[in-house]
């Protein structure tokens, strides 16, 4: 992490120096629990927390100074900067640091696949370049500016993930990051409590086009493509089903990944082994290949970036336990991602299929209908056993025609699963982040005891 300079922070934020001791800081932190010696502590205030209550804790752990909104603060011998709004100050600092950079910035947004696509892009560029990338899925109005504030200054490319919950969110992030390249993975039904409609989801994701010069979009998502028609910059398409600039051909899916021919514009087809299962991960890979090719990355680096990739935790992880094949896709869920996961379950099935499915949260007035439709489709697909987790899935469970169980929470669902699964089963575990579906496996006694750990 590069050093932060006091005078630059004041210039960026318009803040007032209440006391001056240290003029350089080892980095920026908003968490008093993890702050490191010499870092600048920025006290954020949220709905359930106020960083100003932990100023003393931050200093006790070696913070080199503080940015806060208090009229005064009694911390003698420390650098104190007062601002009117600490969140805006965080944005201002990140915007200022971004403005000092001339390296290309690639931003990734969309309903599904953002994190995996971002990591695949970073893996490709990382074969020969220093990459700054969003940590995990810290893709919001706090995580993204913190990522930018962590620049060393010698990065050669930035790969930033942008998430949204309401209209205008992507615009806020783009105003900070100023992306040169935009990747939009798809548009689907998610966070409808904030958006209200899928049209608003698309409108919000495509706010990114007001900033980027080049857009890379999924040609298999016709609804997304319709929204890009008026874009005045360069559009690169990728896809499997439809004509696109970047395509995958001769796809050979396997249990632990897929092989396919990668077709890039004007280049010879190259064979790829992607160590990620699922058709949607091929689309994520095509997005990464498209943007890398546009940036002049060699095909050999694209191939190496894919084949050295090791996946993203809690996203379509394949595990085996006592003859049971487990698909753990527990990070999040919405109707489109659930359908894709079920498709993968059916492809990998051996004998019985078991779906442990938690509520899909934040769907607003569409929630009841969405849950019922998913359950009906599972019945039509011939799923053998359904364990419904949470009130929404439980309410929709009446639509299921196979063997059905209900559970209040993920841990209870795991107890049910441990009673009914048997050798040869293929099990899918999925649900929204708030359902904490990773706890399903914690309830299996052998796992809890550490026997043959998954």
Question: Can you say where each PLM-predicted feature lies in the sequence?
Answer:
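Acidic, Mg2+-coordinating active-site environments of NTP-dependent enzymes
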Residues: 8, 12, 68-77, 183-325, ...
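Short beta-strands and strand-loop turn motifs
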Residues: 103-109, 183-188, 218, 285, ...
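ATP-dependent carboxylate/acyl-activation modules
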Residues: 108, 313-315, 434-440
